[in-house]
Amino acid sequence: MCSMNVLTLKNISYSYHSLREETPALKDISFSVKEGEFLAIVGPSGCGKSTLLSIIAGLLAPESGSIITNSANPAQEKTKIGYMLQKDHLLPYRNIYQNVMLGPEIQKIDTPQVQNYAKELLKEYGLSDVMDKYPDELSGGMRQRVALIRTMVLNPTLLLLDEPFSALDYQTRLYVSADICNRIRKANKTAILITHDLSEAISLADRIIVLSGRPASVKREVPIHLSCKRDDPIVTRTAREFNEYFEILWKELYHEKH
C-alpha cells in the first residue's frame, strides 16, 4: 500500500447550534487516510459519525481544525469525492442507466467516453441486462450496486460510505458488502466506511477508528490483519483473529474503563 496520505484531519471540532443552546458534536479529531486504504469508523449511536463524514465531504465546515488533501487546492479535490448513503436514492422515473449517468449530466461531463465507461461498469457488476429497467424492478442488493456504480462513474479518489448496507437484510448485506468492498479494492480506491456493525467493520476494513460518545473524539485506532482472504464474508468471520478484534472493539465502545 502506498504511504501517501490522501486525507489528513487535524483537530477537527464541530458543534450543533440552536436558539437555546450549543451542543458539542466533535472534539479535536485527528487521523490520516492512506491511498488505497479501506478505513472504518465506529462509535456509539448519535456520536457524530455522519457529521464527521459530511465535514470530510465539504458539506459542513468545521468550527476549528483543518482538512488536508493530497491536492494543492482542496477546492479541486471536492470533485473527486464520492458519497454513498444508507439509502440508494435512485430516482424512480429514471431507468438504471439514466440513474448512473445523473452525476456526469449534472457536472456536464456526460461525454461518449463517460457513457461507455458507465456501460462497462454495469457490465462488470453484472447489471448490463437491467440498464433499461427502473429501480422498483431491482432487489435491494442490485440497487446498492447501482448506487456504487453511480458513484464510481465519476472516478472519485476517495469514497465516503455512510452505512450503505444497513437497509439490506442480513444475508444480502453480508454478500453485497463484501462484493462492493472487493470491487473498491480492485479499483484501488480509498474508502471511509461509517458503520454500527463491528463484524462488518472487521471483515471489510484495513483499519478501524473508534470514536467516543458525544462530543466524539478518537479513542483508539485498530489496524486489522486477517489470516484469510476477504472474498467470502462467512470465511472472513471465521478467521482466528476475528473474535479478538471484536472483543477489543466491544470493550472500547461499551465498557467504561475505571
Can you describe what each PLM-predicted range is?
Residues K133-D136, L154:
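Conserved signature/switch motifs of ABC ATPase nucleotide-binding domains
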Residues A57:
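Helix-to-loop junction immediately C-terminal to a conserved catalytic motif
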Residues Y97-E105, Q115, P223:
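Short helical segment in ABC ATPase nucleotide-binding domains corresponding to the A-loop/adjacent helical element
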Residues L159-D162:
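Catalytic Walker B motif of ABC-type/P-loop ATPase nucleotide-binding domains
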Residues V42-P44:
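The feature captures the beta-strand-to-loop junction immediately N-terminal to the Walker
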Residues L148:
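Hydrophobic anchor residue at the start of the ABC signature
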